[in-house]
Structure formats: C-alpha cells, structure tokens
C-alpha cells in the first residue's frame, strides 16, 4: 500500500443500490457519501497521498432534474457541514471539471472549499464534478493557443486540470467494465479493477 501514490474511483451503483434497498436513488447517493468518507479515512491510515472520485460526469446532465438537484444539494450541504473537519485533518480538496455550467451557489461552495484547503498536505482529494476527460484534453489544447509547434504530449499533460501524479490504480464499482470518459489520458498505464459490488457496499 505504501508504494501507492494515487488511487481513483468511479463510484457506480449508488442509484441502483437505493432501489435495491426498496428506497430511492437519492437514498443511494446519500449512502454513497459514507463510502467516500471511509475511503478517505483509509487513505489517511495507509498514507496514500492522493485519491480521486468521479462524482458527476458531463454526461450526467441527462439524468432527471430532481436527481441532479439532490446531488448538488448534497454536495453543498456536505462541504458546509464538514469543512472544519476537512481542515482539521489537513485534507486538500481539488475540483476538476468545467464549473461554468454549475449554479452560482454550488460554484461558490466548491471554490471556497478549494481556497480554504489549498495549503493542506496530509491528503489530496480530487473530486471530478461536471467532468469529462475529452473536455479536459480539449481545454488543455486550447491553452496552447492552437500553436502546432507547442501541441505535444508534454505540453498537453502540463495543461491538464491538475499537475499531479497519475493514478496507480483505478477501481470501478457497479459491474460495468468501462471508463465512462474518466481520466482517459491519465489512465494510460494504470492498473484497472472492475468490482461487481455497488458503491455503497
């Protein structure tokens, strides 16, 4: 475990878990937050410095509006409630994705959280929100000002959303064997594990 620098998770199966428990999809998302907390705590115990979670993809806007509203409200409430504990445990929060499509209050919450935790060094937690890997690569290339001489592997990597070591391991729960447009560039040499269990399990 100590040789690992970065573990990434595609947290699939929250909604299905909620329905399986004869409850709502939203209930599954709520329980999924508890699993995120467990993974964060485990990372601290085993001294894994970076952990990433695929929270909301750029394709998730196709979901029912009520579910989307619940998800973002859950994010907002969580950070307002837990920001002191996050700071106390020296956890740094990074947000990757396009924030321009998010509501003002959600955007404000996310930006404030990253600002308040930017000096913390015990654990880096990356949250992919309104994230799509294809968008990330496009955004990186745009920063190069369409200069063909500067468009190369090194410069594209330099302009990705975060300048951090790429994941050593990716775990996707929920049974599906696909990457769903998550960190396609960064996962080139990553070991990938597909888990049948749903995320809250």
Where in this protein do the model-derived segments appear?
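Flexible, compositionally biased loop and terminal segments
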Residues: 1-201
């Amino acid at each position: 475990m100590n040789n690992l620098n970065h573990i990434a998770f595609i947290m699939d199966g929250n909604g299905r878990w909620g329905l399986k428990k004869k409850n709502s999809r939203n209930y599954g998302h709520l329980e999924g937050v508890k699993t995120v907390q467990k993974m964060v705590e485990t990372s601290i115990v085993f001294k894994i410095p970076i952990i990433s979670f695929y929270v909301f993809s750029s394709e998730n806007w196709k979901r029912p509006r009520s579910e989307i509203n619940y998800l973002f409200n859950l994010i907002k409430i969580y950070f307002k409630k837990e920001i002191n504990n996050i700071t106390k445990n020296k956890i740094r929060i990074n947000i990757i994705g396009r924030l321009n499509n998010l509501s003002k209050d959600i955007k404000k919450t996310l930006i404030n959280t990253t600002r308040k935790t930017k000096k913390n060094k015990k654990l880096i937690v990356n949250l992919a929100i309104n994230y799509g890997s294809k968008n990330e690569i496009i955004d990186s290339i745009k920063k190069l000002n369409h200069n063909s001489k500067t468009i190369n592997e090194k410069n594209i990597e330099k302009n990705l959303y975060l300048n951090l070591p790429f994941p050593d391991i990716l775990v996707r729960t929920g049974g599906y064997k696909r990457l769903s447009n998550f960190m396609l560039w960064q996962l080139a040499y990553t070991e990938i594990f597909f888990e049948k269990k749903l995320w809250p399990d």
